[in-house]
């Protein structure tokens, strides 16, 4: 393959020297004027870089002025806890992140733990909900399907309780995976994650009138195969419904009129033929229906139902508190400073891909190859990143750059803002668009 031909790059200083506003528990960052260096895309030299890995015994707090879980492990003094956000930052160094993941959990005397699998059709809102539960946008989100390509893990730690979230790709059928040449992870990860689940959260997008009236067939298969795992139903995007009465009909259909072994008092007649049978909580259970029923549209073994908008903090907090109460006595799996199992480079690549899916039309974003060439600490302690975006067509180059370089600059700026919130440090990011010959 010939060497890629360099066209240009968007150069953005993402929120360098940003100021902090709002409460410490929920930080918000405002970019100072001029953080976007020019409207036109600028060419940059493509120097091959390497991942920077600072000394593990150097204080991350002194480098970036942030709380570091690694510092707590190594015994460095910490700032006043009242000045530290409740949600931990992710280290910008792969070695530090990996060390934290394998470190002995700093669990309390009576620890509690819960492993939660988020299950649903593509674009049901699983990653958005995961981000809201975690308090950080560590998982990629877009309106296009298959934004999440493989299983990702997030950790919520509050007091003596740890909740581990497994954000799975939208569940698909083997036929669709083969037809569209999708990764095996999209097919396998939702199923493998169920093997270690303590609770399943089934997410349904009620704004999609074409799919909302029945559970996804693959979701039903998964629930049936792992019927011993408790499950709850979450009706997402309820803010998009003009007629709230629709929620009653959907609840009746998706639960077959039964929640936690009790028949729902809903007058709307169920149209599913399988709804005529109402199992009792003691006489029957999920194992009685281990054989798949092709006519089934709902699952009568949900323990609870939640109706929410994943963008509404109050709604999400109600679900979060429920998850915390469902945790059972047991050892933690991770140190309290762990927010996600992803490496910092994976988070960055996913964030860039999220913006590509959001802003590029049709099939264009799916053909972009990403290659990180620089990941290092700058002279002022900022994180310096350069990623090359390789595209197969010259027309795609023009689309990605945008008029006068505005689109590539906007993408870089938004990615930088998100990364600054995740890493708690200043970010300088360069995106270089190249054509593959």
From Swiss-Prot:
Subcellular location as annotated: Mitochondrion matrix; Mitochondrion inner membrane
Region G2: start-end pairs: 146-150
Membrane topology type: Peripheral membrane protein
Chain residue ranges for the region called G1: 120-127
Region called G5, residue ranges: 308-310
An example Gene Ontology molecular-function term: rRNA binding
Stated family: Belongs to the TRAFAC class TrmE-Era-EngA-EngB-Septin-like GTPase superfamily. Era GTPase family.
UniProt xrefs under PANTHER family: GTPASE ERA, GTPASE ERA, MITOCHONDRIAL
Protein name: GTPase Era, mitochondrial
């Amino acid at each position: 393959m010939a060497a890629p031909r360099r066209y240009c790059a968007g150069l953005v200083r993402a929120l360098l020297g940003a100021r902090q506003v709002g409460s410490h528990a929920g930080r918000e960052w405002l970019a100072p004027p001029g953080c976007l260096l020019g409207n036109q895309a600028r060419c940059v030299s493509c120097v091959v870089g390497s991942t920077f890995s600072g000394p593990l015994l150097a204080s991350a707090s002194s480098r970036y002025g942030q709380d570091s879980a690694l510092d707590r492990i190594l015994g460095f003094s910490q700032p006043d806890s009242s000045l530290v956000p409740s949600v931990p930052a992710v280290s910008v160094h792969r070695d530090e992140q990996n060390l934290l993941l394998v470190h002995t959990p700093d669990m309390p005397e009576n620890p509690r733990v819960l492993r939660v699998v988020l299950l649903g059709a593509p674009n049901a809102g699983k990653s958005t909900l995961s981000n809201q539960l975690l308090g950080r946008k560590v998982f990629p989100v877009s309106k296009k399907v298959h934004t999440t390509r493989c299983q990702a893990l997030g950790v919520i730690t509050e007091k003596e309780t740890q909740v581990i979230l497994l954000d799975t790709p939208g569940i698909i059928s083997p036929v669709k995976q083969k037809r569209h040449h999708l990764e095996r992870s999209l097919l396998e990860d939702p199923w493998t994650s169920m093997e270690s689940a303590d609770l399943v959260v089934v997410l349904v997008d009620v704004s999609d009138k074409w799919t909302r009236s029945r559970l996804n067939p693959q979701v039903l298969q998964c629930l049936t195969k792992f019927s011993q795992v408790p499950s709850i139903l979450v009706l997402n995007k309820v803010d998009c419904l003009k007629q709230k009465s629709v929620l009653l009909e959907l609840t009746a259909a998706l639960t077959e009129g039964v929640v936690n072994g009790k028949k729902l008092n809903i007058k709307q007649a169920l149209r599913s033929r399988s709804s005529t049978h109402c199992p009792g909580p003691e006489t029957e259970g999920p194992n009685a229906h281990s054989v798949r029923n092709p006519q089934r549209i709902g699952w009568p073994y949900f323990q609870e139902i939640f109706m929410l908008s994943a963008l509404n903090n109050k709604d999400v907090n109600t679900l979060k508190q429920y998850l915390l109460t469902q945790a059972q006595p047991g050892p933690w799996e991770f140190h309290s400073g762990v927010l996600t199992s992803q490496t910092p480079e994976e988070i960055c690549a996913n964030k860039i891909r999220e913006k590509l899916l959001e802003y590029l039309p049709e099939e264009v974003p799916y053909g972009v190859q990403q290659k990180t060439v620089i990941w290092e600490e700058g002279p002022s302690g900022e994180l310096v990143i350069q990623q090359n975006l390789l595209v197969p067509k010259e027309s795609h180059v023009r689309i990605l750059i945008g008029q006068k370089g505005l689109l590539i600059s906007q993408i870089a700026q938004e990615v930088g803002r998100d990364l600054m919130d995740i890493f708690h440090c200043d970010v300088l990011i360069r995106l270089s668009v190249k054509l593959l010959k």
